[in-house]
Amino acid sequence: VLIIAVLFLTACQLTTAETYSRGRQKHRARRSTDKNSKWTRECTRSGGACNSHTQCCDHFCSTATSTCI
């Protein structure tokens, strides 16, 4: 009877640990997509205001007018 009780408790611990790790993995995936969305930026279309070439979709910012060309 003691051996059966030990086996049952071991099985319960393994099942709980597996379920817990799955839940944490889902949250990790969600966090990584949040981080990725922070890193992606939208570009400014032609005619929009800019300060550098990297802001423009066509990667050309006129320094004279501060607009994307």
Curated annotation (Swiss-Prot):
Domain notes per entry: The presence of a 'disulfide through disulfide knot' structurally defines this protein as a knottin. The cysteine framework is VI/VII (C-C-CC-C-C).
Pro-peptide region(s): 18-41
Database matches in InterPro entries: Conotoxin
Highest classification ranks of the organism: Eukaryota, Metazoa, Spiralia, Lophotrochozoa, Mollusca
One GO cellular component, as annotated: extracellular region
Domain of life: Eukaryota
Range of residues in the leader sequence: 1-17
UniProt-recorded Gene Ontology molecular function terms: ion channel inhibitor activity; toxin activity
Record-annotated disulphide pairs: C43-C57, C50-C61, C56-C68
Tissue: Expressed by the venom duct.
UniProt keyword annotation of Disulfide bond present: yes
Something else known: This precursor corresponds to allele E1g. Has not been merged with other alleles since they may differ due to geographic variation (see strain in PubMed:19606224).
Locations listed in the record: Secreted
This protein's UniProt keywords: Disulfide bond, Knottin, Secreted, Signal, Toxin
Protein's UniProt name: Conotoxin Eb6.20
Broad class of the protein's primary localization: secreted
Family affiliation: Belongs to the conotoxin O1 superfamily.
